[in-house]
A protein has these predicted regions:
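Residue-level signature of transmembrane alpha-helix interfaces in integral membrane proteins
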Residues: 60, 125-127, 250, 311-316, ...
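ATP/Mg2+ or Mg2+-diphosphate-binding catalytic cores
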Residues: 300-342
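Conserved ATP-binding subdomain of kinase catalytic cores across diverse folds
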Residues: 9-206, 211-213, 218-300
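Low-acidity, Ser/Thr- and Arg-rich intrinsically disordered low-complexity segments
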Residues: 351-359, 363-365, 370-385, 390-393, ...
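Walker A (P-loop) phosphate-binding motif
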Residues: 337-353, 366
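Short, compositionally biased leader-like segments
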Residues: 1-10
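Short, surface-exposed amphipathic charged segments that create phosphate/polyanion-binding patches used
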Residues: 96-97, 348, 379
Length: 397
């Protein structure tokens, strides 16, 4: 649960000041985003959640600076500066420091991106082009190749994945979430078995860990234009541990979210082009394992909304969303095992019914495994085709 004080007079005053400067306001769990025609200003909320604590002005300044630095890696022309909001002696709020003023808060100033060129919108409106996919993969592989690397031993990497998998079991099986504990436990058992029995596939990936993005979703990806390069916004700035990833896991996560929007062939193209662009491509089985793990992460994030008192009336919706991700996790860990069966006889035979047992509410989830595995022949066309889907909100700012 997010712990936040009642909005103080100072916070309310800062919000009112920013509202007067802007034409549109977006509120998230952790921030307000104030939009003008050309810019966006992000103000962190004074909230506390786990290791994340934004309850002091100094903490909010630091996380703004971190957000600026980290996001400039993939969006150097989008993240412009960190600005102080100051109060004069006569009580007037303004941007920037001047003599006799006192800092009351900090904001990240960004260039506003056109919503029509965000990946989720392009998927929804069927405007995605082949060159968009190629440019995106090229940008991401360049980022992966140049990113800071983490030194981690092969046994420790496997151990860390096992710890994460077990933590998912504990978190998702919490009784108050109301999810199918038997289904969750079976998925976890299959993921654990994969890690224990297929260490030869997993261990070498320890050499590829980078300080990555951590939240590579379609709504965070700007496809660029004739005069503007692609960018990726909104990395996980508040927890470096969550950003230490195998690039293959980042691609698997993005592909999962594209499938959620009905863009199975796009997901296939992203994975195929990434594997073709790297000197050490991950196996198909490992990509499916990472997809299963990513789906568990998304299920957990959806389920956590059930605990939020402000979202109590939407608890059934979030439970359904979590269950759909659990269904996807089950399908992909089964598929990872089938890849291995084709190469050798596995030591354990996963239950063929796991996907069905975990498919509560999954019929409405736009994820067609056969179509993803065998995309249509339109790959030679100038556009990427996939079923029309409603939605596509563009960026959060």
């Amino acid at each position: 649960m997010i712990k936040a004080p009642q909005r103080s007079g100072r916070a309310s005053e800062v919000v009112r000041f920013l509202r007067h400067q802007c034409s549109e306001v977006i509120e998230t769990h952790f921030a307000w985003i104030f939009l003008t025609d050309l810019h966006a200003y992000k103000l962190k909320k004074p909230v506390r959640r786990g290791r994340m604590d934004y309850t002091t002005i100094a903490a909010r300044k630091q996380v703004c600076l971190d957000e600026l630095t980290l996001n400039r890696r993939l969006a150097p022309t989008v993240y412009l500066e960190v600005l102080p909001i100051t109060r004069s002696r006569d009580g007037i709020l303004a941007f920037g420091r001047r003599r006799g003023t006192r800092v009351v808060d900090w904001v990240v100033k960004m260039r506003r991106l056109p919503a029509a060129r965000m990946l989720d919108r392009a998927i929804a409106e069927r405007t995605l082009r082949k060159q968009d996919v190629q440019s995106l993969v090229s940008m991401l592989t360049g980022f992966f190749d140049g990113a800071v690397r983490q030194q981690l031993s092969e046994p420790r990497y496997v151990e860390r994945l096992l710890e994460r998998t077990d933590r998912n079991r504990r978190d998702l099986c919490a009784p108050e979430l109301g999810l199918d504990a038997r289904c969750i436990s079976r998925i976890i058992e299959m993921q654990m078995a994969f890690l224990e029995e297929r260490k030869a596939l997993v261990r070498p990936r320890a050499a590829h860990l980078i300080d990555g993005h951590g939240d590579l979703r379609p709504e965070h990806i700007y496809l660029g234009s004739a005069s503007d390069s692609p960018s990726v916004i909104d990395c996980l700035e508040f927890d470096s541990e969550l950003r230490w990833v195998d690039p293959a896991e980042e691609i698997a996560f993005l592909a999962l979210e594209c499938r959620k929007l009905g863009a199975g062939p796009l997901a296939h193209a992203l994975v195929a082009q990434y594997r073709a662009s790297t000197l050490t491509p991950p196996s198909a089985a490992l990509m499916d394992f990472y997809t299963s793990q990513s789906a568990m992460t998304r299920a957990k994030l959806a389920a956590w909304h059930v605990r939020d008192p402000e979202l109590a009336r939407d608890a059934a919706l979030w439970r359904t969303r979590a269950s759909r991700y659990l269904s996807i996790a089950a399908r992909y860990i089964r598929r990872a095992s089938r890849h291995l069966e084709a190469a050798s006889t596995p030591r354990t035979q996963p239950s063929a019914s796991t996907g069905q047992r975990c498919s509560n509410g999954a019929s409405g989830f736009p994820d067609n495994i056969r179509r993803i595995a065998s995309p249509n022949s339109g790959a030679t066309e100038s556009t990427v085709s996939f079923p029309a889907q409603s939605g596509g909100s563009g960026p959060k700012w």
